[in-house]
Amino acid sequence: MTTILVAADAKWVRDQVRSAFMSRGQTVVEVTRGQDVRDRFAEVNPDLVVLDMQIGNMGGIAVALDLRLEESGGRLDRANILLLLDRKADEFIGRRADVDLMLVKPVDAGVLRRAAKQLLPAAS
């Protein structure tokens, strides 16, 4: 079973991700606040984390940095992180946050599934 953790305060972003991964053998877990990602990650140990760049007071960049710091401290497993950008120019900061893949919103279900396949070869 593949578990995808999506963090976005915008319902339409969470809906896009959920619709892309609504298939047998896949579970989508949602959080609406960036500060909740670390705890939820520890609970579900997802195969993929999808972060919206703009999430309230702790955005996707800060969350990605937090996950990488927790990983380097041995407190969390390595996370495959897909960052959803607002514009292509944001790729610079995404690279600084050590995310695995970036996509510019809006993205459709097919694009999200192809991105997941790049990060998770066994994902369907």
Model segments located where?
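His-Asp phosphorelay/catalytic-motif detector in bacterial-type signaling
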Residues: 72-80
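Alpha4 helix (beta4-alpha4-beta5 surface) of REC/receiver domains from two-component response regulators
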Residues: 62, 83-102
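Conserved phosphotransfer microenvironments
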Residues: 47, 51-69
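C-terminal output helix
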Residues: 107-116
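Two-component signal transduction core modules
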Residues: 49, 102-103
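Acidic, metal-coordinating helix/loop segments flanking the phosphotransfer/catalytic sites
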Residues: 32-48
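The C-terminal output helix
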Residues: 117-124
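Conserved acidic segment of CheY-like receiver
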Residues: 1-12, 17-18, 49
